[in-house]
Design a protein with these regions (language model features):
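Conserved lysine of the Walker
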Residues: 46
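Hydrophobic positions on the alpha1 helix immediately C-terminal to the Walker A/P-loop
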Residues: 49
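Conserved nucleotide-sensing/catalytic segment adjacent to the nucleotide-binding pocket
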Residues: 62, 71-117, 128
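Walker A (P-loop) phosphate-binding loop of P-loop NTPases
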Residues: 43
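Charged, amphipathic alpha-helical linker segments immediately N-terminal to NTP-binding catalytic cores
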Residues: 1-16
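The Walker A (P-loop) glycine that initiates the GxxxxGKT/S ATP-binding motif of P-loop NTPases
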Residues: 40
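Small-molecule kinase domains that catalyze NTP-dependent phosphoryl transfer to phosphate-bearing small molecules
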Residues: 138, 167-183
């Protein structure tokens, strides 16, 4: 007799995916495409979770990052920054991503805030599309997603992760600017 185990071994980092994977599988039986939004606090693991989903599902998963929709310099005003999510060009995200969710292929302009330039991206609408980053659940978009995830983190862990990822010089920007904008 061939041994057929009824269990699977996975790393602990993937264990947190189980409820999300189960919900996604239920939705997949009802829909050809499942749109997942991952929003949350700075350094809470949004990009990591999106990468884990992309690794798990392989070619069936595409990821769009909200960082590609950072607000360009000419649009940055005090009034705009006073809005929730004002550092994101949510209008462009709505036009180029949300409006194209039903298309087989879509194009968008990826903004590089370090150079202030755009690059054209072409994306196939995969069976699982993950829209990852702060403000991906911005009210401006309505409720276009099939599955919404919001990640939280303690302030102590957030500080440790930001220092490790961005260094002490950038931590001050997070502490004084980006974290307060998320609250």
């Amino acid at each position: 007799r061939a041994y057929k185990p009824a269990y699977r071994v996975m790393t602990a980092s993937y264990a947190r995916l189980l409820p999300l994977l189960a919900r996604r599988e239920t939705l997949r039986q009802q829909k050809e495409h499942v749109f997942v939004a991952i929003d949350g606090m700075a350094a809470s693991g949004k990009t990591t979770l999106a990468a884990q989903l992309e690794h798990f599902y392989g070619a069936d998963c595409g990821v769009i990052h909200m960082d590609d929709f950072f607000l360009p310099l000419p649009l940055r005003t005090q009034e705009r920054y006073a809005e929730p999510g004002g550092n994101i060009h949510y209008e462009r995200f709505g036009q180029q991503i949300i409006a194209a969710m039903g298309e087989k292929y879509f194009s968008y302009e990826r903004y590089d805030c370090a150079t202030g330039t755009y690059s054209s991206m072409r994306q196939e609408n995969r069976p699982i599309m993950v829209l990852e980053g702060s403000y991906s659940l911005h009210p401006y978009f309505g409720h276009p997603y099939d599955l919404c995830v919001f990640l939280e983190i303690s302030s102590q862990e957030q500080t440790a992760r930001i220092l490790k990822r961005n260094g002490a010089e950038w931590y001050r920007d997070f502490e004084e600017k980006w974290i307060p904008m998320e609250q």
